[in-house]
Curated annotation (Swiss-Prot):
It comes from Drosophila melanogaster. This is Interleukin enhancer-binding factor 2 homolog. GO terms for biological process: mRNA splicing, via spliceosome; positive regulation of DNA-templated transcription. Residues 367-396 are annotated as: Disordered. Its main location: nucleus. May regulate transcription of undefined genes. GO terms for cellular component: catalytic step 2 spliceosome; nucleolus; nucleus; precatalytic spliceosome. Disulfide bonds: none annotated. InterPro entries: DZF_dom (IPR006561), DZF_dom_C (IPR049402), DZF_dom_N (IPR049401), ILF2 (IPR052134), NT_sf (IPR043519). Transmembrane segments: none annotated. It is found in: Nucleus. Residues 374-396 have a biased composition (Acidic residues).
């Protein structure tokens, strides 16, 4: 008989028990917009004049929006490709290597948040059959042939000639002016049947199906014009500030929707207030370990979107937002928007209206003796420590 146990294998009272792991309860960071009733403004201070900031935001949005010629070029190409794919769903003809179930536009072009100079539209093609590499090749050739046949009566310039390029996600159809990315997916019940040597990558298939859910949610919940303006400005920030580059397009969609629509009045906030609120939330630790963050509304299981970032990336995003929030508070919005100067304000000391602002530095340091596989343990440890200490999760 095993020591410490009764006959029959039942453990004795007081025997060795597994260590108790406290349940992680995420907390919401401080949000001045939601807590404004508890922090009334000083009457003598008066309202802040943000007219200059509002005008700068609208001007920057106009600069970042695609020109009418760009919109026309990408719109025409998308219409032609969509017509060919829709026809293959109904009448596949001699295409026998795969069967199409559905064709859906996704991404920035469909949402109306595309940036100028990035004339790329995304279309997800869901296959009834398994997505083999041979099937993708055959589909690309069929689409190219049908596209040429549909345009045989048109007079095409050299720049209007289409090229097809196959890649790991599907294939691209492009001309000099625009490009349409065909992203291949399959029915959810087929995902478990995929084999790495034969079919396209399982994770890529999941991401393409997720893109459909993201676009559907956006059309239903984030169609307000102010949200699209803010998303376009945030996308530009991710291009110019390295600290924000880990933020995915889906994260930007969600934080823009949160900043504008999640308030006591349930009415869209003005663009200037929403722009400030984004930096306030990130500075307060919205995307730090221990924070409730933003739950992905399209996924089961209460997944916080910022957990896709590493701990270093979460820290850099937070302290960079804190620096930029201080710059914004003292009138440095033109440097943040890229209308003047450069991005050195997050790396070098700067002076704004007599106020000296020094950039903040990293708080989190990754242990050098741990492997990449220990990252989840680090996150759990930090979140549990924060829970016990009752900190505000702000990387000051």
């Amino acid at each position: 008989m095993v020591r410490g146990a009764l006959r029959g294998g039942r453990p004795m009272r007081g025997g060795i028990r597994p260590p108790f792991k406290k349940t992680f309860v995420p907390r919401h960071p401080f949000d001045l917009t939601l807590a404004e009733v508890f922090f009334p403004k000083v009457p003598s201070a008066g309202a802040v004049d943000d007219s200059a900031l509002t005008a700068a935001l609208l001007k920057r949005n106009q600069d970042l929006s695609p020109t009418p010629s760009e919109q026309t070029a990408i719109g025409n190409l998308v219409t032609k490709v969509q017509a060919v794919l829709d026809n293959l769903v109904v009448a596949p003809g001699d295409l026998t290597t795969c069967q199409l179930e559905e064709v859906r536009q996704v991404g920035s072009f469909k949402k109306g948040t595309i940036l100028t100079g990035n004339n790329v539209a995304d279309v997800v093609v869901i296959l009834k059959t398994l997505p083999t590499k041979e099937a993708v090749d055959a589909l690309a050739k069929k689409v190219e042939a049908d596209l040429k046949a549909s345009m045989k009566t048109e007079v095409l310039t050299k720049g209007d000639q289409h090229t097809v390029q196959i890649h790991e996600r599907g294939f691209d159809i492009a001309n000099v002016h625009a490009k349409v990315r065909i992203l291949i997916a399959t029915l959810p019940q087929n995902l478990r049947k995929l084999e790495p040597e034969i079919h396209l990558d399982h994770k890529l298939m999941q991401s393409h199906l997720a893109a459909i859910r993201h676009t559907r949610w956006f059309e239903e919940n984030a169609h307000h014009s102010s949200i699209k303006v803010l998303i376009r400005i945030l996308k530009d920030l991710t291009r110019r500030f390295d600290a924000f580059s880990p933020l995915s397009a889906w994260m930007l969609d969600l934080i823009a929707h949160l900043a504008i629509m999640n308030n006591p009045s349930r009415q869209a906030l003005p663009i200037n207030l929403a722009f400030r609120r984004v930096f306030q939330l990130l500075s307060a630790g919205l995307f730090l370990p221990g924070s409730a963050g933003i739950t992905d509304p399209t996924e089961p299981g209460h997944i916080r979107v910022h957990t896709a970032m590493t701990l270093e990336q979460q820290d850099v995003c937070c302290y960079t937002s804190q620096t930029l929030l201080r710059v914004l508070a003292h009138g440095g919005y033109k440097h943040i928007l890229g209308l003047e100067g450069n991005t050195s304000v997050v790396r070098e000391m700067s002076v704004w209206n007599g106020v000296c602002i020094s950039p903040l530095t990293a708080v989190y340091e990754k242990p050098t003796d741990k492997k990449e596989g220990d990252l989840e343990e680090d996150i759990d440890m930090i979140e549990n420590e924060n829970e016990e200490e009752g900190s505000d999760d702000g990387a000051e």
